[in-house]
């Protein structure tokens, strides 16, 4: 994927923890990168399960591991990279949050948060997410804020320590 994306940073983290050099080749999305991987123009790529699941299941792409600490239910038999690459602390999870303008009233935030949490619990949403290799975890807006701050710290340290910048990414 492109420069500075979560996919790029996941590969940079894996390279840093494994002590190997990887060349980042920026793409405008997963599809052209996957096409080059399938055609043999790339030797490897890091991407999301949702983007690559159909290629993996069809046998066109071989998954070596998942970036979660637990196996992904949608890809049985594919180990976590923490285990497969002998990197016990390697974990990268893609997450999405519901965001509103900062001036939004707390009452509206509460209504939206409650509705989102209820929707995420429904069997239909759970199944739809599982079908594409994803899962849902609701929570509070405060918990999302903590996650946000932790992710900024985590990835900021990687970017600063390895001197990653958009001119080099």
Curated annotation (Swiss-Prot):
Main localization category: periplasm
Pfam families linked to this entry: TctC
Family statement: Belongs to the UPF0065 (bug) family.
Source organism (scientific name): Pseudomonas knackmussii (strain DSM 6978 / CCUG 54928 / LMG 23759 / B13)
UniProtKB keywords: Periplasm, Plasmid
Annotated PANTHER family: BLR1237 PROTEIN, TRICARBOXYLATE-BINDING PROTEIN
An annotated GO cellular component: periplasmic space
Gene3D superfamilies: Periplasmic binding protein-like II (3.40.190.10)
Subcellular location field: Periplasm
Protein name: UPF0065 protein in clcB-clcD intergenic region
This protein's record includes keyword Hydrolase: no
């Amino acid at each position: 994927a492109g420069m500075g994306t979560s996919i790029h940073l996941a590969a940079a983290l894996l390279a840093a923890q494994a002590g190997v050099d990887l060349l980042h080749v920026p793409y405008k999305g997963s599809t052209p990168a996957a096409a080059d991987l399938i055609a043999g123009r790339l030797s490897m790529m890091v991407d999301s399960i949702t983007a690559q699941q159909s290629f993996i299941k069809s046998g066109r792409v071989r998954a070596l591991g998942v970036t979660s600490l637990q196996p992904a239910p949608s890809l049985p038999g594919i180990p976590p990279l923490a285990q497969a690459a002998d990197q016990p602390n390697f974990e990268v999870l893609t997450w999405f949050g519901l965001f509103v303008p900062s001036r939004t009233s707390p009452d509206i935030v509460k209504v939206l948060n409650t509705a989102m949490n209820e929707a995420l619990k429904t069997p239909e949403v759970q199944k739809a997410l599982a079908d594409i290799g994803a899962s849902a975890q609701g929570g509070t807006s405060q918990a999302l804020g903590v996650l946000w701050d932790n992710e900024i710290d985590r990835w900021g340290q990687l970017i600063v320590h390895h001197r990653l910048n958009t001119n080099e990414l």
